[in-house]
Amino acid sequence: MPRLTPIVNYRNIGISAHIDAGKTTTTERILFYTGVNHKLGEVHHGSATMDWMAQEQERGITITSAATTCFWSGMSNQFSSHRINIIDTPGHVDFTIEVERSMRILDGAIMVYCAVGGVQPQSETVWRQANKYNVPRIAFINKMDRTGANYFNVINQIKDKLYANPIPIQLPIGKENNFVGIIDLIKMKSIYWSEIDQGITFEYKEIPKDLMVLSNSYRNILLETSAEASEKLTEKYLYKNLTEQDIIEGLRIRSLKNEIIPVTCGSAFKNKGIQSMLDTVINYLPSPKDIKYSKKNKFLSKNYKKSILPKDNEPFSALAFKIANDPFVGNLTFFRVYSGKIRSGNTVLNSAKDKQERFGRIVQMHANKREEIKEVRSGDIAAAIGLKDVTTGDTLCDPLHPIILEKMEFPEPVISVAVEPKTKSDQEKMSSALNRLAKEDPSFRVSSDEESGQTIISGMGELHLEILIDRMYREFNVRSNVGKPQVSYRETIKSCVEEEGKFIRQSGGRGQFGHVWLRIEPNKSNIAKNKNNYTFINKIVGGAIPKEFIPAIDKGIQEQLSNGVLAGYPIVDVCVTVFDGSYHEVDSSEIAFKIAASIAFKSAFMKASPILLEPIMKVEVETPNEYMGDVIGDLNRRRGIIDGMQDINMGKIIISKIPLSEMFGYATDLRSQTQGRASYSMEFLRYNELPNNITESIINSNQLK
């Protein structure tokens, strides 16, 4: 079957934002104006297409990334039909994993900002994730109708907080209640949307006289920005005039190189600015043909020598970026095709696990609705039914042309709770449910406390775990008792120590003999490229320890990293060197050297000024002025450090750094202090050394368990 849409007309985009910036409403308007939906879905009514989970509809927030497809030919039908594959991602920091894996497979992104709140903590997190994968972006400054809206303030924040180069291609006409339309700086026309038909129709008019000077000023910036894209455009700018198409061409070149961020504006809720923003997606975000899929941009693993070409006649390659459990069809594997094509019933190689898998059925997803299709090609995003052993980040490829795409990296959990089923008969059901949820969400971990036998679940925040426990009940009918949240501390050292470890058992018959000297020191370089930032160095010379025993020494140390020494928490940021030792020709074995290494490591660790590290969160509290003193006092009591304050309409944003352990229950306390008028956001910042008195308390508490 021939391709219906040329790949040059594909746009694989994500829509990302801080919570409450209006991202899902923006997506709903896109679906309405592109004809996918025939009525407007509203977040506050619980009727948003993309927020289909019960928890999303109840809470009015996005929890899981949702995929859909629409087609767009331009406001004035100036384009041939373009296929836009959209992934709507969560705005809450607890679900940042959904943004991470979406950014990995997207070609472009729309960053939505609230015209009042501007660039907020999760906006910065999402920006870093987009930078990591070098994703070209446009900005949509939403909620221009809200009290306190300030378009130019948000542009300055994009510049100052995100270190980006925002280039306005539109200006708002009015603001707050007087926001009525936009000025298109490329056409130099104003656009007004009809309020009678929900913004479906619009008209171009002349720019209001009182905005002409401002428009000309920003138009000149636009012309200069575009002219810098190439010598041809520079010459034309200097000696002739740039046409509308020249300006778009120059901005596109620079946008695809991530040199600029085209900025648009509007009000999704008031049905203004969405169609013109869609035109911006077509003009300035890349098609798959514009992206280089190679080792150089960290797309391919280092072992692969070629680049991937997004052509249908190339060998098949795809990345599985999400696993979801569907109550009707079982596991759904979401994947992005980079080259070639695949039909339902075909067999592919999961090169990450070296296993072949059969594509049972292929479906096109529209939020939680499935449309069965027979074939997908390069550039497509779809889901497969029937893949048995695929996990997030696995490469699927032609068995005759194996390839490995660079795997995704996921953040380590920062919070844990103990869970147990309300009835013993549900123990097996709970284990099965938790394992299925963990397969879906790589930032969610399930483990067992060896001493107490309790099941421990770990995640990115209180809300993250609360949602997963709720899902366990709704989707798997397992009720559970949940313990108090526990912080995921880390252990490390501050000094360098050399230590000997011996394990000798020689009491008749075959004995055991292992003898090592280890040097352990802080690993501050962060070059280890593993989650613990652990480096192992072998400096044995002269055969003091045979080569075959060196891996056992490394293994003995790594087991201690997982179990901890000081208080039972994972050990991070250590470099261990084995530099001497001895062996017995008959009695030495792998197990003996493994135990000897463990003995030496534990002893050295306790002598190397061990400390506990705690997760520190960046917390931003938005509060009316009259409660500012109470809020700051409470943050100080929580061991918070105030980094700064920003003025907002009738209030302040207080920016602080606070240990996660002090933030449990903060939402309730803040509501109480401010009569429900303040709000806060929080994201993980880094690990810091724990004060001595709290360290001693935690060690003593863990020893009593």
From Swiss-Prot:
Pfam families, alphabetized: EFG_C (PF00679), EFG_III (PF14492), EFG_IV (PF03764), GTP_EFTU (PF00009), GTP_EFTU_D2 (PF03144)
Segments forming domain tr-type G: 8-289
GO biological process, any: ribosome disassembly
Main location: cytoplasm
This protein's UniProt keywords: Cytoplasm, Elongation factor, GTP-binding, Nucleotide-binding, Protein biosynthesis
Function: Catalyzes the GTP-dependent ribosomal translocation step during translation elongation. During this step, the ribosome changes from the pre-translocational (PRE) to the post-translocational (POST) state as the newly formed A-site-bound peptidyl-tRNA and P-site-bound deacylated tRNA move to the P and E sites, respectively. Catalyzes the coordinated movement of the two tRNA molecules, the mRNA and conformational changes in the ribosome.
Family (UniProt): Belongs to the TRAFAC class translation factor GTPase superfamily. Classic translation factor GTPase family. EF-G/EF-2 subfamily.
Protein name: Elongation factor G
Annotated organism of origin: Wigglesworthia glossinidia brevipalpis
Gene giving rise to this polypeptide: fusA
